[in-house]
Design a protein with these regions (language model features):
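Short loop/turn segments immediately following beta-strands, especially the blade-tip
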Residues: 226-227
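Short glycine/acidic-enriched loop and turn motifs that connect beta-strands
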Residues: 15-19, 60-64, 105-109, 153-156, ...
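Blade-edge beta-strand/turn elements of extracellular beta-propeller
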Residues: 31-36, 75-83, 118-130, 183-190
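Short, conserved, GDST-rich strand-edge loop motifs in beta-rich repeat architectures
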Residues: 149-170
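C-terminal structured domain segments
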Residues: 161-166, 173-208
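Conserved beta-propeller blade repeats
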Residues: 1-12, 33-58, 79-103, 128-147, ...
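Beta-propeller blade signature
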Residues: 24-29, 70-74, 115-121, 166-182
Length: 227
């Protein structure tokens, strides 16, 4: 279940009688529900497309399964496929819905991760040459700058993103930002100023974008980086 706005939710529904799965919209208490579209995958991620009447969805990332990134109008029409061909993919829209980050395995059943960017139609894929997950990223409101946590060396013979999502290991991250239009990267905080180890996820920025917040999976505490 995710929020569409202040007064509606999107949710996946499984009908045990018909065995059909669907994406639906309703009031927060479940009333006034409507089916948006039928879906074929058992587990999906859902994200509204900002500043549009669309909602996007995709099968939950799995290194052995090709991810199908789709969108559909909330008034309920046929779903449109935006992007396919990547395994274990996950997505993160920017603030105006013109771009989405996509993290995916470097191969089917792979142990590496690539981060790329696509436009709102799923085209113009660009590999950003950053080995990180979208769960370690956050967009600036300028819609072109991405703040991200970059992991150090990963264990051998892991399956990504499956093993990370299953919390079979933790990472040791450093913090960066990148202009996705130019490819320019800069550290957010220098190494000598970092104390402790951080496996950062659920990143978000302060309203003035002067601070970066994240949850450290090592101790489940909230941290702040002042920029």
């Amino acid at each position: 279940v995710i929020w569409k706005d202040d007064n509606k939710i999107f949710y996946k529904y499984f009908n045990p009688s018909s065995k059909e799965r669907s994406l639906n919209i309703a009031n927060p208490d479940g009333t006034d529900w409507e089916k948006v579209v039928d879906i074929s995958f058992k587990d999906i991620n859902i994200a509204p497309v900002p500043q549009s009447g669309l909602v996007s969805f995709w099968n939950t990332p799995d290194a052995f399964q090709e991810t199908v990134f789709q969108s559909v109008s909330i008034v309920g029409k046929s779903a449109k496929t935006l992007f396919t061909g990547k395994f274990g993919a996950d997505y993160l829209w920017n603030w105006d819905g013109t771009k989405s980050l996509v993290s995916h395995t470097d191969a089917r059943g792979g142990s590496g991760i690539d981060l790329g960017v696509i436009n709102d139609q799923g085209g113009e894929y660009k590999n950003l040459e950053i080995p990180t997950l979208v769960s370690k990223c956050v967009w600036s409101k300028d819609n072109k700058t991405v703040y991200f946590a970059l992991s150090g060396s990963l264990p051998d013979n892991i399956l990504m993103p499956n093993d990370y999502d299953a919390k079979k290991f933790t990472t040791t991250d450093t913090f960066w930002k990148m202009d996705v239009t130019t490819g320019k990267k800069d550290r957010v905080i220098e190494l000598e100023k970092m104390q402790g180890s951080y496996d950062a996820t659920n990143l978000f920025l302060s309203p003035d974008e002067g601070s970066l917040f994240f949850i450290n999976r090592i101790d489940d505490k909230l941290y702040k980086v002042t920029m």
